[in-house]
C-alpha cells in the first residue's frame, strides 16, 4: 500500500501517520528524514543536498527526487510506504509518478487531512515556553496552572516568534497556496480522498481505515 499523506500544519497529519504505519507496518517516510539519512550516510546526493542546505538554499528538485528514488528502492518499502511532506508541487508529483513507474510501483491513495485554517490558528499559536527551564505549555492542550507563569519555577512564559499569530497565518497562507494545485492534480487522477480532520483522532482514523481497508 503506497500512500501520500497531506494536510496543513496542525491538522493532525503526524498523529494519523503514526497510527497508519503502526497498523499497516509500512515505513513513514518524511522529506526531513530522507535528507538526514542521505547526509548521515554520506551518499553523493546527500552531500549535494547538504551543500544547498548549508547555504540556506532550497534543495533542487532533481536532487530531492534522486534521494526519494534511493529511499523508495530500499527493501522496507516492498509492502508499501507512507510519504509525508513530499511531493509539495505538481512537478514533484509528476516526477514521483515517473520514478514509481520505473520501480514497478504506483500511488494507491492520497489522503488529505482537511482542517479550516481558522481552527488551526489557535492550535498553532497556543504554545508558550519557559525561558528559564525550557518547560513547554499549550493554552488549550497543556495550560499552566497560572496563566503566563511556569509551573516549575514561576518564570514568565514567552512565545517563540514562529508561534506568533502573524507568523502562523502567513505560514498557513503559503501552505494553502502551495497545496491547492497538488490537491487538484491528485483529484483529477482519482487518487485523492479528503477527510475532515476537525474531529476526534480515533474518529478520523476510523475513516482512514475504512479507506485503506484491512491489513493483509
From Swiss-Prot:
Subcellular location: Cytoplasm
SUPFAM superfamilies named in the record: P-loop containing nucleoside triphosphate hydrolases
GO cellular component assignments: cytoplasm
Lineage: superkingdom: Bacteria
Keyword Metal-binding attributed: yes
Catalysis: reaction(s): AMP + ATP = 2 ADP
GO BP annotations listed: AMP salvage
Binding site for AMP: 31, 36, 57-59, 85-88, 92, 160, 171
InterPro entries, alphabetized: Adenyl_kin_sub (IPR006259), Adenylat/UMP-CMP_kin (IPR000850), Adenylat_kinase_CS (IPR033690), Adenylate_kinase_lid-dom (IPR007862), P-loop_NTPase (IPR027417)
Residues annotated as signal peptide: none
Region feature NMP, mapped onto this chain: 30-59
Region (LID): 126-163
Keywords per UniProt: ATP-binding, Cytoplasm, Kinase, Metal-binding, Nucleotide biosynthesis, Nucleotide-binding, Transferase, Zinc
Residues where ATP binds: 10-15, 127, 136-137, 199
Entry's free-text remark on domains: Consists of three domains, a large central CORE domain and two small peripheral domains, NMPbind and LID, which undergo movements during catalysis. The LID domain closes over the site of phosphoryl transfer upon ATP binding. Assembling and dissambling the active center during each catalytic cycle provides an effective means to prevent ATP hydrolysis. Some bacteria have evolved a zinc-coordinating structure that stabilizes the LID domain.
Known partners and oligomeric status: Monomer.
Protein's recorded name: Adenylate kinase
Organism: Exiguobacterium sp. (strain ATCC BAA-1283 / AT1b)
